Every structure is written in structure tokens, then in C-alpha cells.
């Protein structure tokens, strides 16, 4: 393919990106530019206020536009004529297409009238926050691509991408071309490609302030549209900057990400400030008045599954999308769940219950696939037991099983407590609860200490509103939501009695017993091993004696209810605290030993936790829990 100024192609030249351009013949005679064309070009340039033959006059844009429009009719093959028309204010897609098409002649007329380098050019809108100046062939191609992308049609996106791809292949590091690639993919809602393009660019120290601001807001928005809210927020946290439109878009995106994170209070603050500054912005007004207004998310897989890569309308919805890697991922999830379940120390009955649960769901789905009658079953669960007995971890295992079997689309688990659901004002609780449930859809909502929702016993407790909202959503989203409630058995029974609809939806119970002292010692040994630590034997004996005493004693909890002291300590959670605190005691002991500063410690010394380390760690832990152990 002939490049710029290369070869002859029988009356048709091809520029460096493969676009067909008419040969410059109409305004040339025997290879020379027609003198009349040169004279008219000089007159038009003066009307733009550009120095011609080192002389200039005040600009007259109307005259320049009229003159260049007439010039393009007689010199339609001259890029400089089209560039002048764009500089005079006509940046219609036809003009920009012509400038791109005739780009191989750029500079021909300018040299005839001795224009300074880059004197003739125009600013064009990229279609997303930034404007670039076009003075040369590749600039004109980008300006045309931007105009194509601004029309918003799949065919135009494809054409624009073809134009820009030809440039980036030759000039991979040119930021202007990379930004146009971002713009095209942004407008076509190809968010994963926007992220790929911007990630290596966004922290470039050579970016000017406006470019850096635009890049961060665009990347944050793309990440949010992919449902990657935490990384999105890192780019949207400070949305202000030199690009005013980007600052508004960034603040709105930040608010909606906070809403997706179920931080409605912070989202509302951002929206209120934004609305005060921009009351004319309809999206901001809608987001402020409607708490269900949020970010529409997709996935890279769904984007790639489009029948037309540039048409968002051909993208499969979440319900219709079949991930080609889903089968392998589901099998991996089931295997992972089995391994995690097998690694648990104790909890034999819990393991059996979870295994039966898996079998029940698996066979239910098989019967459904065969067209056999399937009894309407609820998949919501009650996990009853004291703190630290593995309820949250088993909930994650159940989420993997449900997802691996295809009952749920995600293995995500959203763990919440009363404070996450309850608001301070009328209407706030319903909004917060709905937002929490929205974030848990297609996964598991894990409500720990569920009884706290109604612990006050007051008829006007907002917790009752949260329960009503939860029940309604469990019915309306029964195919997309699994709820697991957790807490002490007696407390959960009281909770289930507060609303007649709860018992019928939570029919499957799994009881989590307190660990035995021997099991807790096993847990301590395993935790230490995973951290490259080891308890000396006497330390393990002391731990078992401690756990046995705590298991035999009772202590009132914060509500005055007598509980096993070991349950108040937190069972497995208490063990983790002991391991971590004992390691700190070991480090302190070694740092104050005779070898401190020399580093002359054996691996055994660096790993061993002694009985004294344990003893010094346990006392402050028990004191912090309000517990004591009788001798």
C-alpha cells in the first residue's frame, strides 16, 4: 500500500490508513497548482487572520467561511482548502471527511503562500471532554473519526475504529490517537476495552492536567459500568478538575458508585452538592429524587458476546448470557466448596447438612431439566449457633455450591447487620434495605445477628420496616436472592416469630455447635502452621485447659443473658486473636533477647510460640472481653 507521497496508482492514491483519496488533478496544471487557486487561498487565509507572505489583517470568519466554501468547489482535491473551511467554523462530517480523504495534499497550498508551520489548523471536539488541534494528515483522520463516533451508530463506530486503528498501528504511543480509540469504545459502551486502553495511560506523568482529569473520570466510569465499584471509586474519589463537564460526570458517577456500595448517606451528600451547583442537570435531579436510579452494569463476557461488536443493543442481557467458560467455572466452584468444607475441624453434623443441601438442590435442578414436577422449595437458610463457629465461612461455601450448581449466578455473599439496613428517618430504612438487597442479587445475603432488627421490641421500630421490605423482595426476587440469617437459636426463634411470613420462608435450619476444647486446640495449631508458626507442646496444653475452663463457665452477655464464657469469647474467633497476640509476644521476647539486633536466630526460634507467650497474650484478651477464668 502506498504511503504519504508514495507512488502513483492510476489516478487514485491511497493514504497511509487505507482510505481512498482522489488524485489532485483539478487544481493542478502540468503538476503545478493553478495560480487562481493559490490567490483565492491566500485571500481566504488572510480572512482567517493568518499571515500570508508575512502580512496579516484582522480576521473576518464569515468571509473566510464563504471563501473557503467556494474554494473547495474548484479545488476539491486540496486538503488545505478543506482545512481552511473547518478552521472557519464548518466542521460538518462532510468537511472533515474531505479533509481526511485529501490528506495527502496537506500543505501544498500553504507552501505556495509561505504560511508558517501549523498556522492553518482547527480545534475539534473529540466527543469526550477534550479538544485537539488538527494541523496535519493524521490529525485530520482523527477529526473525521471523532465526527463519525459522535453520530452514535454502529456502522459509524466501526468506520471510526478502522480509521484510528490504522494510525495506532503506526504510532502506538500517540496519545491523541489512543484517546480517540477510548472515545469510540466509550460511545459504543465497550467498557472493558476502555479500561484496557486507559489503564496504562492514566498515570502517565507527562499528561497535562486536563488530559489526566479526563482520563481518570473516564476510567472510573468504565470500571463502574463493569460493576468494579471499589477500583472505580479510587479514580472518582476526587472528581473536581479543569474539565468542567468531566467534573460533573465524575461527581455523579461517584454518587452512584457510593449508592451501589450501599452508602446512601454519602451518595446523597454528593448529589445534593451537585444539584446545588447544577440544578439544570436532569440526571442529577433524577438520581437525587429516586434512590433506585443507579449504574447499569455489564460484564466483559457479555460485551464480547454481542452479535455486532459496535452495537450495544445486540448485547445479551444478564438473563440470556451464556458464558462459554461457565461450565468449567461452576465445576471449579463445587470442587473449591468441597475442599473448604473438608478442611473444617469438627462441625461434622454441619458438613452432613451442607452435603444434603447440595444433593437436594442438584437433584431438584436435574428434575426440572427433565420436565418432572419439582416441589416449590425455599433455599433460604437459618444458621443457628454462637459466634465464631464458622457460620459466615459456611455461608461462603453454600454460596459457591449454589453458584456451582447454577442456582445462583454469583458466589458473592453480602454480609450485613442491623446498622446496614436501618435508617434514622421515615422512608430511609426501606431505601437502605432495598439498596442492600440490590447489591446482593444473584448471590447470598447473609444477615448476622438477625434478631437485632427487632431487639427493641417497640412497635414503631424501623427494624419491622426492614423485615417487611426483605420479605417483599424475597418474594419478588425469589429466583435471584438467597437469604441466610444467623445468630443464637433462641434469638432467631424470636426473630422468626415477629412476622408470620418469616417461618414459611426459612424452613431449613443448620445448627452450629460450640467447639470442644480439643477442636479449638486443633484450630490453633492449624492457624499457626499456616502462618509459619508453631506452638510448643506445653503451650497447647495450657490452651486446652483454658478452653475447657471457659466452656464450663457462664457469663452474662451485654443483654444480661447467661452464655458460655467460650461463646462470649467467640470460639474460633477467640483462637485467631490468641494466635495473633501470641505471635506479637514472641516477637517482643525475641527483640529483647541477647540476639536482638544481630539477627542470629534459628528458624525454630523465629517460629516457636511458648507457653509464656500464650500466657501473656491471653490475660489482656480476656480482660477486653470482660471475662476471667477461675483458678
UniProtKB/Swiss-Prot annotation:
<keyword id="KW-0963">Cytoplasm</keyword>
<dbReference type="InterPro" id="IPR049078">
    <property type="entry name" value="T7SS_EccA1-like_N"/>
</dbReference>
<dbReference type="InterPro" id="IPR011990">
    <property type="entry name" value="TPR-like_helical_dom_sf"/>
</dbReference>
<feature type="binding site">
    <location>
        <begin position="385"/>
        <end position="392"/>
    </location>
    <ligand>
        <name>ATP</name>
    </ligand>
</feature>
<dbReference type="InterPro" id="IPR000641">
    <property type="entry name" value="CbxX/CfxQ"/>
</dbReference>
<keyword id="KW-0547">Nucleotide-binding</keyword>
<dbReference type="GO" id="GO:0033214">
    <property type="term" value="P:siderophore-dependent iron import into cell"/>
</dbReference>
<protein>
    <recommendedName>
        <fullName>ESX-3 secretion system protein EccA3</fullName>
    </recommendedName>
</protein>
<dbReference type="GO" id="GO:0005829">
    <property type="term" value="C:cytosol"/>
</dbReference>
<dbReference type="InterPro" id="IPR041627">
    <property type="entry name" value="AAA_lid_6"/>
</dbReference>
<dbReference type="GO" id="GO:0010106">
    <property type="term" value="P:cellular response to iron ion starvation"/>
</dbReference>
<dbReference type="InterPro" id="IPR003593">
    <property type="entry name" value="AAA+_ATPase"/>
</dbReference>
<dbReference type="InterPro" id="IPR003959">
    <property type="entry name" value="ATPase_AAA_core"/>
</dbReference>
<dbReference type="GO" id="GO:0005524">
    <property type="term" value="F:ATP binding"/>
</dbReference>
<dbReference type="Pfam" id="PF17866">
    <property type="entry name" value="AAA_lid_6"/>
</dbReference>
<dbReference type="InterPro" id="IPR050773">
    <property type="entry name" value="CbxX/CfxQ_RuBisCO_ESX"/>
</dbReference>
<comment type="function">
    <text>Part of the ESX-3 specialized secretion system, which is important for iron and zinc uptake or homeostasis. EccA3 exhibits ATPase activity and may provide energy for the export of ESX-3 substrates.</text>
</comment>
<dbReference type="Pfam" id="PF21545">
    <property type="entry name" value="T7SS_EccA1_N"/>
</dbReference>
<dbReference type="InterPro" id="IPR023835">
    <property type="entry name" value="T7SS_EccA"/>
</dbReference>
<keyword id="KW-0067">ATP-binding</keyword>
<dbReference type="GO" id="GO:0005886">
    <property type="term" value="C:plasma membrane"/>
</dbReference>
<dbReference type="Pfam" id="PF00004">
    <property type="entry name" value="AAA"/>
</dbReference>
<dbReference type="InterPro" id="IPR027417">
    <property type="entry name" value="P-loop_NTPase"/>
</dbReference>
<dbReference type="GO" id="GO:0009274">
    <property type="term" value="C:peptidoglycan-based cell wall"/>
</dbReference>
<comment type="similarity">
    <text>Belongs to the CbxX/CfxQ family.</text>
</comment>
<dbReference type="GO" id="GO:0016887">
    <property type="term" value="F:ATP hydrolysis activity"/>
</dbReference>
<dbReference type="GO" id="GO:0006879">
    <property type="term" value="P:intracellular iron ion homeostasis"/>
</dbReference>
<dbReference type="GO" id="GO:0006882">
    <property type="term" value="P:intracellular zinc ion homeostasis"/>
</dbReference>
<comment type="subunit">
    <text>Part of the ESX-3 / type VII secretion system (T7SS), which is composed of cytosolic and membrane components.</text>
</comment>
